Structures are given as C-alpha cells and as structure tokens.
C-alpha cells in the first residue's frame, strides 16, 4: 500500500507533540498538579521561598534597569518623544532625553551618547546610579498610561556602554582656535580639589571651553570619589568611572593623587600663591556621622562605618581601582546596618557579598520615611534583607571582644510631627557586625583650616551662591556634597557643570574679557563629528544628504526655514501649480497606517494621505524660494512643480521657478490620487512617452537641473526613469507614495471618511512600510542607468535606513513620514548617525559590528550570563529547578574565584584609531549593487542552517512553531526544559531567526553537509492525476 503523503510520518508527529492546537474542550487539571506545574516553570522568585541565594563574591550587575539592545530598542520605540518634555525638566543636568532616546530608537547609539555626554560628562555613571524614579522617570508622560513610564536610566546606560565599546576619544570643540591661538585667559591655572563627580564634571566643561591648565588634586591614590569608593561594583563598575575620567583626560586635564587639604600640602592660600586663578572645591563630606554609643569600637570588634566598610569592599571587588588587591572583609553571621539612605542599602547588599548570613536594616522612622530610592529598596528586599523600622540604637553589647547585640528603643511620631523615643519599649537584637550609615560630615579641623579664608555656614559647610556656586572668596567655587544641596551623583555633576560657566565668566573678567549673557557651554565632540557628509549631485553641493520631501513637512516656506535652522541640507517646496490648476483639499486627509497593528502614537510604520498639492499660489512659492536662498545660500532649495500634459504650462511654470532662484526643479509626475483625475501627476507619470516629452519641454525652458519624480505604481519603473533621462532630466526621485486603501471599520466605512457620505478614495501610502518597494525602485534604476542621479524617498527614517538607500545607488535622501512621526530635530540624529556609520567603517577593531550594533554576547535581561554548559557540561534553562541549579553553580564558581584571589588586570585604554580612510558619501553610493542580480545567479550549493544559543534562549518556542506550521518541522522542543534543538533536516529557510524575539539568539551558519531537497516522491514519477 502506497504511503499517505498528506499525513505526517511518526518522527514528525513526535516533533509536533507540543505544537499548538485549536481547543475543543475546557481544560481539567487538579489544583495540586497546577501548583507543581507552576513551580516547574516559575521564573520570578517564589513568594513562599525563605532561603537566601548565596551571593558571596558575586558582584555581577543586579540593576533592574539594565537593558540589552533588544530591550533598549523596544523601550526607545515606546517613548513618545514629547514636546517640552517633562523628563528633561526633571533631570538635574537637563539632558535632552527626548533626543537621545530618538537616536536609540534609530540605532544611532553614538548620537545618543553624544547628546548624553554633552550635558553630563558622567552620563554612563548616572545612567547606572541615578534615582530616576524621583527624577526624569517621575515626570514621564507615559506614567499616565497603563504601560507606565520609560526606563530612561536603562536607555542612558545602554547607549553610553555601546559608545564606551566604540573606544573613541573626546576632542576639543572643533570651532575653537588651536591652543596656541587661544587668548591668554585660557591659559589661566585652575585647581580642582577632589576627583569626584562634581570636579570631573567641572573640569570637563572647563576643558571643553578651551582652558588648558586644569589640575585636579585628590587625596586618595584612586580617583572617582564616592563613585569609586562607596557605590558597589554591582551597581557601578570601576571601569565605567575610569572611562569617564579618561574622556576628561583626553582634553588635557591633569590629576595628581596623594594630595590632601592640609597646612603641609594644599591650602587655598598656597594655591593662590602658586598662581592659580580659580579653584573648585569638590571634596565631598569625608567623615562619617556616628552615634556616641559606638565610640571606641573597632573593626576587629565588628563595627564599621559606611566610610570604612564600602571602600574596603570596593578595593577588593573593583578591578583597576588601585594597584593593591585586598581580600573582601570577612563578614559572618548577622549584620545590622543602621540608616535608611542609599548608602545604608549599599552597605546591606554589600554585606551579603562579604559572607553575611542575614542582614537587618534598622532605621529610626517608618517605611514611608525611607530616604533611599525605591530601586535600591526593592533590590535589598529581593535579596532577603530584613527591614526594622521605628528603632533607635541605645547600647552596643560586647562580649569577648566582639559585638554580640545592639539594644534599641522604639521611636514614635506625635501629633505635631515630632519624633520621640520611648525608653519603655526596648528591643534587643543579636548581631555579629554593625555598620553605621547615618550620613557624612566635614569635621576635620585641618581641612577647614586649609580652606581658609572662605566662610562656613551654621551647618559647617562653605557658604555658596546656589546660582554661581561661588564661595565668599570670589575666585573659589564649590559643588557636590560639600555644599549641602546635592543629594545624588547627578546633582553633584550639575553643581560642577554650573560652576564651570561661572568660573569661566570670572576668569574672563580678570583678563578684561566678557562672555555671552546666556550661558553657552560646548557640546561633547569626538573625531566622528569631523566626518564630512557633504555630497555633490548634478552639479549641486549638498551640505548633507538629508532633505525634506515635497509633502506635509514643507506645507509652508516658514516651515522650510525652521528646517534649515535645524540643520536639514535641502528641501523641496510643496508641489505647486499655475493658478488655473489651484486646489482645495478635503479633510480628514492624513491618517495613521494599519501596518503597525494597534500601535498608537509616534513610530507609525506608515501613513496614508489623500492630500493634494499645495493650496498656496505659485507666486507665494516663488517669492519664498527667493527669500530662502537669500538667507540660506548653502542650502539647496528645489521647487516642486506640477502641470497637466501641456507644453506651454510646463515651460511657463518651470521658468517662473527658475527665476525665483531655485537651485533645481522636481517635476511631480506621480501624485497617486486626486491630481490624476485632473490629468496631472500620475496621469502623466505612468507613460514613458509623456514623461519623455514633459522633460524635453522643461529642458528647453530652463538651465538649472531638474528631476522627475517617479511613481512606484507602474510595472516597470526603469522604463519611466529611462524616458526621463532621454528627455533631458538630470536625475529622478524614486519614489512617490504607493497607491492604497488603508483600512475599513467594522461597519464597512473607510478611514479617512470625508463628509456625511463617508466617502474616500485610494490614497498614497508612505513610511517605512514602503521602504522595500522604494529600495527595489532605486536599485533597479541604479543598475539600469549607472551614474544617473537618484533622489531617494520612501521610508527613510534614520541614518541607518538612509545609508541603505545610498548603498542602493541614491545620492541624496528625502524624508517625510519620519518628520510626521516626530519633528524637524531628527536631522541632528540623522547627521550624527551617518557620520558614525562612516567613521566606524575605518576602525578595524569594529569590523565585526553591524553598523553601530556590536555583536551580542550571551545574556539574559541585558546582563551577561555564564555559559553553564561549559562549567558543567549540561544545558540548563533559566526557570524553575534549572534556575536554582544555575544559581548554585554560579555561587560555587564565585567562591572558587574568591579562593584563587587572583590579581586584577590593569585597566588600559587605548582609543581606536582609523587604520584606513574614512569613506565619503560618494564612496558608498551604489555599494550594494554588486550583490544584486537574478535568482539564477544565486548559489544553491552554499547553504546555511540554524544554530540556537541556549544560554540566550527564553524558551518561547516561536522558532519551533513557525518551523512546524510554516516550514520543515526541523526543530525539536524539549517538554521539560523547553530548549529547542535544530535537527539535521533544517533547510536554512531562516523563518526561525525571523520570528525569534532575542537578537542573535539564532544565527545562520554554513551547512557542512550537502543539501538534498526532500522531493516528496522520486523525480520522473508519473503524476497521480
């Protein structure tokens, strides 16, 4: 009996065991069975689990905000990029958050980092440790929606880390004269005391302003201040602090360690005697606040202050912090941490990593009074730290030379808000170690004497003007913890930033110079910003290849003016006609597309419009062109014009446009709706003969270049382009919108629906949804007509997509829908993005990157994961009992490494230097054409197969399902571990990779065995019917 071909064989049926099936009955499972199921598949901590994960010597990232590229792109796309964004107003350094998130969503990580470091020289540090819930995130408008605020800190960290991996140095503002030609004032000696965040920020901005003799004096043998010594490695790795310090040193800032404030080393008076024109005090608050009951207690007895404990932990866990490598403090048994601020929580979680069995956070007030940010509180809670509120320490009990307990009294708040201690309510808490984290002060009389003659306030802190950061001594400024206004790293950074401008203003005044009334601090610059992205096409010089298409963003000439002010290289006017062809639009006429599904807000992949050409007169546009060219001579203005198939009309209108001063013309032969009914637009652009003749008429009429705007709504766009060239056109625009009907409502009415009759017409679809059509059009024209100039349009929404069109053969790029999604300022992102893409092509060390995307290391939730299979020879997923096994293996590995006590390798930073020329725009035009051809030219010998990285796999089974129901049933799915395995029947179709939600979890690699297609039946078998 012949086999039944339309039934799966037994092997395939086995593979399909877990494939989804439509449900025909309600499910029935016992509660006990479901409890067991839940335990097996659980990924988050079990609420009934009371055992603590072994964290000793585990200093891996624990932040919830950390993002990998996938998470960053999804989160950035979710951002609304609001007008007058509240997130920016809530940031102490006033980061342009909207702009840097825009860059991330466009995969321009360099551009995002440039925006971040321009306003915050410690942008990576702050991305990691900022209490964003109380700052930028607290003002996010998406807080008013179901999905909640954007993870701004995680996005800031991600972009900054990618830039860090690029290893590109900071440079002086390119607009500054060389150092030798700078005015004398810029050689003034400036001293900064303390190498913490405030000083690093202040020095960075002063160096960006052009000052060349800046020295930071630091009493420790390491730099970074509290970022280095008190914020733990698992929240802020030392290589991050070092990276930002190296960026500062790129500008020539000097650091001298081992120099403290004292009569015998550094004083303000000695600095003045040595010729320093200005000084900045950023020494923080170096001494701990302690309760009298701890007087005389030592570390050997089990007592630490946060100022003792955290630096000890840092020195043993932060690679590169100092030359020494000391062991972790040996903390055993129960630990009491006193305090409710961020430092107390850092002490608590650090104690677990030093071996503490249990940690109790004890504080005087209630939970609602905890000063630590919610992010830190939640982390301590997850790590099973215990919280004991309303307790004030009264007595430390010592036996045998060791702390054994602490006695507390209860605190209560009365009706007036005053806190009282109730001596009748006593709590006796056993402990082996006590860590006091009650805050910091400036107490050392030697330091105060060295700061003489500045005045101190009643809190024993320097008197400082909160606007200028100037002390009572005009040449001395201060910022950070020492001032008493900054409570966070980012506020200290802003103090230094604020002070830098007023130090600049002060020094310039000393040399008889003035500064602008409005502060103008320079941006962050690197060699990327020096890349030339200008391009020539048809004899026209474009300052950059990005321009506005003839569409909604150029509705009026004042909009074009604003676009040029923002940085756009060129613009087309909205298409205009002779007065006899003037139009009046309908409404509604521009609507969101359905190609993104039910996604609302910006980031739409398509729009549909039934808008006609400009409602403004030719006279308006001609006068506007004249005005724009007068004020923006370096920008290209192209007049977009449209007539019916009438020689006199085309010659008249083109001559008017030329006379207005337009650099070039665009002949709109492709408007897909409305105008075609009038014998214009599409009615002219679908016939090669009509196109050829119109171009001949215009060529007879004008001397300036002109370009025919082509429609994609034809069978053969090359024949239209060839006709335009034969008619004398200097190039073509490819392409206009695609004709379509976007959608119908449930009652059958269309959207947009005009008037009471709810009528509509086929409109023009634009946006990234039509990019594949536009890319095909550009490449086919470029291949058929080599060297023929092409202005690309159709789904260009980033530097990356723009580069695709340049590689396809276009010379310049027109943008519309991306501006409709956002605003004119996206041009800044496009320019920095394109510069970065070109620059990175010259760095040999980054040749494995895909544009600005680095290779993806194995990770879960954006954090690197150890390859468990290499440690134990077995693959384990990240859930249920397998997750517990993983944690145990990792804990054992961390202890093994601790016992080895290997010295940390030194941190060395050698910025990558271009080893080959940075390509110009002309060098990349048409680069992709060599890879395009017919299907017959493709090799069916060189095949690929899928490989899945089990460490990155999140066990969703999407690869398995698509392979089953849309492919070749070549993936097995383990019923217990949900780990997919690719079988040798994989044909390399790549569907699995296409639906996998994790970037680079699936890769296609070369097939090592010959590919033999499954024919179903042997060849040459007679057909059944």
UniProtKB/Swiss-Prot annotation:
Its EC number is 1.3.1.2. It catalyses: 5,6-dihydrouracil + NADP(+) = uracil + NADPH + H(+); 5,6-dihydrothymine + NADP(+) = thymine + NADPH + H(+). The modification N6-acetyllysine is found at residue 384. It is found in: Cytoplasm. Residues 1-3 form a propeptide. Binds 2 FAD. Binds 2 FMN. Changing residue 156 to E: Loss of enzyme activity. Reduces iron content. SUPFAM superfamilies: 4Fe-4S ferredoxins (SSF54862), alpha-helical ferredoxin (SSF46548), FMN-linked oxidoreductases (SSF51395), Nucleotide-binding domain (SSF51971). Keywords: 4Fe-4S, Acetylation, Cytoplasm, FAD, Flavoprotein, FMN, Iron, Iron-sulfur, Metal-binding, NADP, Nucleotide-binding, Oxidoreductase, Repeat. [4Fe-4S] cluster 4 binds at residues 986, 989, 992, 996. Disulfide bonds: none annotated. Its cofactor is FAD; FMN; [4Fe-4S] cluster. GO terms for molecular function: 4 iron, 4 sulfur cluster binding; dihydropyrimidine dehydrogenase (NADP+) activity; flavin adenine dinucleotide binding; FMN binding; metal ion binding; NADP binding; protein homodimerization activity; uracil binding. The active site is at residue 671. One of its GO terms (biological process) is beta-alanine biosynthetic process. InterPro entries: 4Fe4S_Fe-S-bd, 4Fe4S_Fe_S_CS, Aldolase_TIM, Dihydroorotate_DH_cat, DPD_II, FAD/NAD-bd_sf, FAD/NAD-binding_dom, Helical_ferredxn. Involved in pyrimidine base degradation. Catalyzes the reduction of uracil and thymine. This is Dihydropyrimidine dehydrogenase [NADP(+)].
